[in-house]
UniProtKB/Swiss-Prot annotation:
UniProt KW Magnesium keyword: no
Official protein name in the record: Ecotin
GO cellular component: periplasmic space
Chain segments annotated as transmembrane: none
Database matches in HAMAP family: Ecotin
Primary gene name: eco
Function statement: General inhibitor of family S1 serine proteases.
InterPro entries membership: Ecotin_C, Ecotin_sf, Prot_inh_ecotin, Prot_inh_ecotin_gammaproteobac
Site (Reactive bond): M99, M100
Stretches of the chain forming a coiled coil according to its record: none
Disulfide-linked positions: C65-C102
Oligomeric form and interacting partners: Homodimer.
Predominant location: periplasm
Amino acid sequence: MKALLIAAGVAALSSTAMAAKLDEKVPYPKADAGFTRQVIHLPKQDTEDAFKVEIIAGKTLEADCNQQRLGGELEEHTLEGWGYSYYRLDKVSGPMSTMMACPGQKKEQRFIPVVGEGFLLRYNSKLPIVVYAPKDVEVRYRIWSASEKVEKAVSE
């Protein structure tokens, strides 16, 4: 009987923790039909102005030796009444590809990125980066950092 009560307590606590995690995303809207809401939580940095976040959205597709890209634009929106930003990738076009011959090479599954405007964001660990993307699009990210070394331009 004790084991049953303990198991019920653990189940209740774990479901409460899952609900609390979902509430952390509030007040961001739920994803529209056919879209997912993907969230990035960044670690705190001492000098966050020296960092950028590159959003790398894409699909895993069968590809040959050619360079392939998808097209799209990551649009910034503001959450009314809060001033928080969130991002939406509405349309993904392509794939576009170079046209080299690939004799004897098999196609393989590769991550093909979406290229376009709006994918480089400022770094802010205080707020999550919330991206709404089509269900078949995976959102990845990369952190960029500036060098401490600053060069001086030459007058000519």
